[in-house]
């Protein structure tokens, strides 16, 4: 089974390492979301793969029609979990889980939400602000750019209390403008 304290790989590498269309798509995502490398894209894919697997198992359980109450309970549990995570809307179904794509997962990252809220000029700067401890969620400093923000936490993203960015007259903060076309809540 292995040593429980040892970290294990949380992603799966592509089966075809030199597929041109996949490489171009991953590169586009890395640039658009300001990711460090393609490994972060692969982690998002693996995360979604787990949700899709659970949805397929639910569909198999539904088709076997053994126990509808168990199916309904597991279905509502999966969908409510994904709604809290912000991956699905309020009127979602299992088909919506199966239709999820990687950008939906990447949009829930703290780094992306900091940029979308207008707290940083670019996704790269958002990543830097997070790793340097200038961003807080609900008053608690978070230094992980890949932190998946839930819907409830989304409104509490702000500059950390001891960060120099709290001051509205900070030189860098005056240069930060809202990104064009960003849906700021």
From Swiss-Prot:
Any Pfam family: S4
Tagged with keyword RNA-binding: yes
GO biological process: ribosomal small subunit biogenesis; translation
PROSITE patterns per UniProt: RIBOSOMAL_S4, S4
Gene3D superfamilies for this protein: RNA-binding S4 domain (3.10.290.10)
Top-level taxon of origin: Archaea
InterPro entries with a match to the protein in the record: Ribosomal_uS4 (IPR022801), Ribosomal_uS4_arc (IPR022802), Ribosomal_uS4_CS (IPR018079), Ribosomal_uS4_euk/arc (IPR005710), Ribosomal_uS4_N (IPR001912), S4_RNA-bd (IPR002942), S4_RNA-bd_sf (IPR036986)
Cross-referenced CDD domains: S4
Single GO MF annotation: rRNA binding
Keywords in alphabetical order: Ribonucleoprotein, Ribosomal protein, RNA-binding, rRNA-binding
Keyword Acyltransferase: no
GO cellular component terms listed in the entry, alphabetical order: small ribosomal subunit
Annotated ranges, domain S4 RNA-binding: 108-170
Similarity-based family: Belongs to the universal ribosomal protein uS4 family.
Quaternary assembly: Part of the 30S ribosomal subunit. Contacts protein S5. The interaction surface between S4 and S5 is involved in control of translational fidelity.
PANTHER family (alphabetical): 30S 40S RIBOSOMAL PROTEIN, 40S RIBOSOMAL PROTEIN S9
Function as written in the Swiss-Prot or TrEMBL entry: One of the primary rRNA binding proteins, it binds directly to 16S rRNA where it nucleates assembly of the body of the 30S subunit.
Protein name stated in the entry: Small ribosomal subunit protein uS4
């Amino acid at each position: 089974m292995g040593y429980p304290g040892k970290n294990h790989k949380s992603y799966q590498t592509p089966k075809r390492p030199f597929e041109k269309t996949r490489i171009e798509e991953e590169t586009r995502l890395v640039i658009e979301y300001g990711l460090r490398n393609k490994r972060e894209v692969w982690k998002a894919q693996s995360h979604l793969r787990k949700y899709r697997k659970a949805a397929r198992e639910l569909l198999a359980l539904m088709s076997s029609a053994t126990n509808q109450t168990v199916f309904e309970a597991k279905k509502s549990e999966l969908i409510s979990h994904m709604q809290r995570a912000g991956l699905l809307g309020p009127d979602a179904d299992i088909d919506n889980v199966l239709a999820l794509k990687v950008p939906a997962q990447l949009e829930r990252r703290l780094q992306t939400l900091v940029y979308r809220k207008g707290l940083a000029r670019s996704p790269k700067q958002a990543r830097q602000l997070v790793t340097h401890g200038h961003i807080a969620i609900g008053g608690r400093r978070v230094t992980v750019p890949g932190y998946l923000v839930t819907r409830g936490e989304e409104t509490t993203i702000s500059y950390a209390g001891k960060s120099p960015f709290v001051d509205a007259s900070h030189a860098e903060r005056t240069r930060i403008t809202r990104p064009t076309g960003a849906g700021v809540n």
